[in-house]
UniProtKB/Swiss-Prot annotation:
Region annotated PPI, chain positions: 336-366
One of the record's GO molecular function terms: ATP binding
Organism (species): Arabidopsis thaliana (Mouse-ear cress)
Active site location: D135 (proton acceptor)
Entry-annotated residues carrying Phosphoserine: S157
Gene from which the chain derives: CIPK5
This enzyme's EC code(s): 2.7.11.1
Cofactor: Mn(2+)
Stated name of the protein: CBL-interacting serine/threonine-protein kinase 5
Signal peptide: none
Highest classification ranks of the organism: Eukaryota, Viridiplantae, Streptophyta, Embryophyta, Tracheophyta
Stretches the record annotates as Activation loop: 153-182
Pfam family, one: NAF
Keyword Manganese among record annotations: yes
Domain Protein kinase residues, every copy: 12-267
Keywords for the protein's UniProt record, in alphabetical order: ATP-binding, Kinase, Manganese, Nucleotide-binding, Phosphoprotein, Serine/threonine-protein kinase, Transferase
Length: 445
């Protein structure tokens, strides 16, 4: 039988392929008994095992998802495993992304309020369980058949095609546009307070139909975020303006808390808090010996007291399975876009690699900031000594964006050095190069 139609452990019939990432495929499924529709994420264990620590992340993921069962969070129903695959059986959400609704235009304030009420209720519940999401955005918020909002895992939220619209950023695994300034600055941060900032950006987008901080140039967008530099459209009500102004506060210690959000007149209007699900059955299941593959011992553990770190990102494992993190649309069209790449290495590791590589190229290397380095050639070129800078930004946990640009010297010499020496030498730390296009021209910093 073809994989798309096979029966899984005698419990689920697997149907059409919904989408796929680097490590996983997601299928439409249906319970054999009961007929409930589900989404089944199939993870290739061999590929996961090649990444140190990732199997532990799966087990932690299971424990944490058991903590956050809530009407406004996509439910993880159970996890099963064989010797070669891991299966996440998830609630199937039929209504698609909230992003798709926003892409058609801004929402009426009452509709935006309803979605925001549900978002805050779910986030508050997560925080009460010691879990922070850290990548809240409309692409990760799904709507069920009743129009109710559900916070999604990243793998599922990346499946529906995204219709490009001016004013909204479109990336598969997250965007700095929704990230709190303290996270972008690579300082220690409170995950719960960072979530509140992201909720503020989401509310603004719901009401405006565009981002509060938007610029084709990534650095300019960062500057706006660091200053909370945004404007309200004229149709925003005074109450909505007051709330957003308290959500988008740069200092996390002065940012409004969720209990205070719950007390605001704007949110309390027609608000009925949902009741959280009762956790009364184990999520982990063992595979049957009669199935297509044997069960591997230890792939699914029952824990009476799941242990998770404070404000652990409950969804980051599935996020890591997505296939790309393309930020090319954020950069100036004239800049040579292959001067930007993303890395799964830490910012510190990336900086050390850049310094080592460029020193081996006989360049003078000097750090100007913790995560910015200037490199200068030791010989005169056509237009003096070639000089370039590299800056590393951690835009999400375990994801760094690196930007190279020429600060002095001849453009052709820079292009040749970058293409023939820098890029090949950095390949082992690169997750993806962005927007390779050999016909574009470089632009100085």
């Amino acid at each position: 039988m073809e994989e798309e139609r096979r029966v899984l452990f005698g419990k689920y019939e697997m149907g059409r392929l919904l989408g796929k990432g680097t490590f996983a495929k997601v299928y439409y499924g249906k319970e054999i008994i009961g007929g409930e529709c589900v989404a089944i994420k199939v993870i290739n264990k061999d590929q996961v095992m090649k990444r140190p620590g990732m199997m532990e992340q799966i087990k932690r993921e299971i424990s944490i998802m058991k903590l956050v069962r809530h009407p406004n969070i996509v439910e993880l129903k159970e996890v099963m495993a064989t010797k070669t695959k891991i299966f996440f059986v998830m609630e199937f959400v039929k209504g698609g992304e909230l992003f798709c609704k926003i892409s058609k235009g801004k929402l009426h304030e009452d509709a935006a309020r309803r979605y925001f009420q549900q978002l805050i209720s779910a986030v508050d519940y997560c925080h009460s369980r010691g879990v922070s999401h850290r990548d809240l955005k409309p692409e990760n918020l799904l709507l069920d058949e009743n129009g109710d909002l559900k916070i999604s895992d990243f793998g599922l939220s990346a499946l529906p095609e995204q219709i490009l619209q001016d004013g909204l950023l479109h990336t598969q695994c997250g965007t700095p546009a929704y990230v709190a300034p303290e996270v972008l600055k690579k300082k220690g941060y409170d995950g719960a307070k960072a979530d509140i900032w992201s909720c503020g950006v989401v509310l603004y987008v719901l009401l405006a139909g565009c981002l509060p901080f938007q610029d084709e140039n990534l650095m300019n967008m960062y500057r706006k975020i660091f200053r909370a530099d945004f404007e309200f459209p004229p149709w925003f009500s005074p109450e909505a303006r007051r709330l957003i102004s308290k959500l988008l506060v740069v200092d996390p210690d002065r940012r409004i808390s969720i209990p205070a959000i719950m007390r605001t007149p704007w949110l309390r209007k027609n608000f009925t808090p949902p009741l959280a699900f009762k956790i009364d059955e184990p999520i982990c299941s063992q595979s049957s010996k009669n199935n297509e593959e044997e069960e591997e011992d230890g792939d699914c553990e029952n824990q009476t007291e799941p242990i998770s770190p404070k404000f652990f990102n409950a969804f980051e494992f599935i996020s890591s399975m997505s296939s790309g993190f393309d930020l090319s649309s954020l950069f100036e069209s004239k800049r040579k876009v292959q001067s930007v790449f993303t890395s799964r290495s830490s910012a510190t590791e990336v900086m050390e690699k850049i310094e080592t590589v460029t020193k081996e190229m006989n360049m003078k290397v000097k750090r100007t900031k913790d995560f910015k380095v200037k490199m200068e050639g030791k010989t005169e070129g056509r237009k003096g000594r070639l000089s370039m800078t590299a800056e590393v930004f951690e835009v999400a946990p375990e994801i760094s964006v690196v930007e190279f640009c020429k600060s002095a010297g001849d453009t052709l010499e820079y292009d040749r050095l970058y293409e023939e020496e820098v890029r090949p030498a950095l390949n082992d730390i690169v997750w993806s190069w962005h927007g390779d296009n050999n016909n574009t021209s470089s632009e100085d910093c």
